[in-house]
From Swiss-Prot:
The modification O-UMP-tyrosine is found at residue 51. This is Nitrogen regulatory protein P-II. The keyword Phosphoprotein applies. In nitrogen-limiting conditions, when the ratio of Gln to 2-ketoglutarate decreases, P-II is uridylylated to P-II-UMP. P-II-UMP allows the deadenylation of glutamine synthetase (GS), thus activating the enzyme. Conversely, in nitrogen excess P-II is deuridylated and promotes the adenylation of GS. P-II indirectly controls the transcription of the GS gene (glnA). P-II prevents NR-II-catalyzed conversion of NR-I to NR-I-phosphate, the transcriptional activator of glnA. When P-II is uridylylated to P-II-UMP, these events are reversed. GO terms for molecular function: ATP binding; enzyme regulator activity. PROSITE patterns: PII_GLNB_CTER, PII_GLNB_DOM, PII_GLNB_UMP. Keywords: Nitrogen fixation, Nucleotide-binding, Phosphoprotein, Transcription, Transcription regulation. Homotrimer.
Length: 112
């Protein structure tokens, strides 16, 4: 099993969610986050004064999947989240040792 964390632009969330549903992903955790990478921040004008905004709004999607669909999920996220512009985000893939569904006690693949 693998955990996929994807940090994407907020306006791409619906597209990514729908595309993942089409490949069989039925659940995910979504968190509003802020951060920066090579994109750094940007300046905003407020009441005539210019301010530097260091952290940019992003969305973090977390899904846990079986090993056989990891590449499909990663490819789907790339295809739907990519704009070709700086700040499109990153995808991280982690090994998952164990999953337990609290309600039923199901474990591993059955709990996903």
């Amino acid at each position: 099993m693998k955990k996929i964390d994807a940090i994407i632009k907020p306006f791409k969330l619906d597209d990514v969610r729908e595309a993942l549903a089409e490949v069989g992903i039925t659940g995910m955790t979504v968190t509003e986050v802020k951060g920066f990478g090579r994109q750094k921040g940007h300046t905003e004008l407020y009441r005539g004064a210019e301010y530097m905004v260091d952290f940019l709004p992003k969305v973090k999607i977390e899904i846990v999947v079986t090993d056989d669909i990891v590449d499909t999920c990663v490819d789907t996220i790339i295809r739907t989240a990519q704009t070709g512009k700086i700040g499109d985000g990153k995808i991280f893939v982690f090994d998952v040792a164990r999953v337990i569904r609290i309600r039923t006690g199901e474990e591993d693949d059955a709990a996903i």
